[in-house]
Amino acid sequence: MSKKLHIKTWGCQMNEYDSSKMADLLGEYQGYTLTEDASEADILLLNTCSIREKAQEKVFHQLGRWKTLKDKNPNLIIGVGGCVASQEGKAIKDRAQCVDIIFGPQTLHRLPDMIEQVRRGDKAVIDISFPEIEKFDRLPEPRAEGPTAFVSIMEGCSKYCSFCVVPYTRGEEVSRPLDDIILEIAQLAEQGVREVNLLGQNVNAYRGATHDGSICSFAELLRFVAAIDGIDRIRFTTSHPIEFTQDIIDVYEDTPELVSFLHLPVQSGSDRILTAMKRGHMAIEYKSIIRRLRKAREGIQISSDFIIGFPGETKEDFADTMKLIEEIGFDHSFSFIYSARPGTPAADLPDNVDMEEKKQRLAILQDRITQQAMRYSRHMMGTVQRILVEGPSVKNPMELRGRTENNRVVNFEGLPKHIGTFVDVEIVDVYTNSLRGKFIRGEDEMDLRRSLRPSDILAKHKQDDDLGVTQFKP
């Protein structure tokens, strides 16, 4: 009888990536298979997030539900990982005796050893340390699950924004070596992955060591990834404006594999609030980045993060945010009401914005961005869009679902053979969260894979001089 593993994941794409690695790790080394049913699992893992309000209470409510399962099955192992685990540590065990393992984002690779310790009789295993980036050396080879894949390129953040817990829960910025990243992506490409999403708390701070001891920048990494055979689209999440340098913008000008969509958090349009947040830039600097980006890549779509009701935010500050939203024309946003995170500098500031006022501001902001997104979507009506087909449609499994370069979901009628490939569709209808497409052509009609060897090019432009030396003139 196979051993079962159930993982519940909250939070960002980095957590989703970490959870997939936990499943791969325990599957390869200990033979566990994933199950959606917690009641039939031998191990329950909760991968937590501490960004939002009441994150800790959410964890303990879930553990309370799992405790009833452990009461019925004393051999059940329960583990808590992620940022809440890193932040709370032993306090989780003190409050929830049913927990056997507590591990941080940087120690998930030690899970097999921790499980063995519990099996041998240890009452609780806690490891929330920050080893350099050792975990990537201990994880099994990547396994593709469809045509898209997340690839972590770095961990942590060293910006210390006043509202953010990430530097305290995931540590400071540490970059993976270039060769490790390229190998992982090449392995995924061999398995049919066509699009990679490079992950990190601040990817444009990437500074990875190379085989010769030099340092690879994020812009250079993007070009290396674009050169990998089979990788046709590159996305990345997430960035910080103060390190969105000109060399990164230049990649948008000459690297078509990099999609015409960028998520660049700004948090506020008020210089006063940006200063209080310790973001390290002003609104005009953010606008300068976007202006240069749109010069390098016409039509690029921009999304962002916004925090509403940060301590001291006035009506004038919020008006500055709305002005920035209109000037930039954001296509999408992740926007939240501010909630103090314990241990951050902003937690000591007086939260003097009325909750009803916060809710009203959030509704106004979200409504404006929804309007802007719908306007962009309507402009796509009648156009032909190239989409990567990810699988069956969520609402209608008889149809297919794909995603445009600018990150819009398109549902259309197509054949199963198109899954994992690119197709061209005409946009025939627009909805709030998706588009409707009509199939135009498949990848076999696009000539995407044509490649010319250098000798072929030379043969077409062969010019011998008097000495018989071949010269090439493009």
From Swiss-Prot:
Its EC number is 2.8.4.3. Its cofactor is [4Fe-4S] cluster. Residues 378-441 form the TRAM domain. PROSITE patterns: MTTASE_N (PS51449), MTTASE_RADICAL (PS01278), RADICAL_SAM (PS51918), TRAM (PS50926). Residues 3-120 form the MTTase N-terminal domain. The keyword Iron applies. Catalyzes the methylthiolation of N6-(dimethylallyl)adenosine (i(6)A), leading to the formation of 2-methylthio-N6-(dimethylallyl)adenosine (ms(2)i(6)A) at position 37 in tRNAs that read codons beginning with uridine. HAMAP family: tRNA_metthiotr_MiaB. This is tRNA-2-methylthio-N(6)-dimethylallyladenosine synthase. It comes from Shewanella putrefaciens (strain CN-32 / ATCC BAA-453).
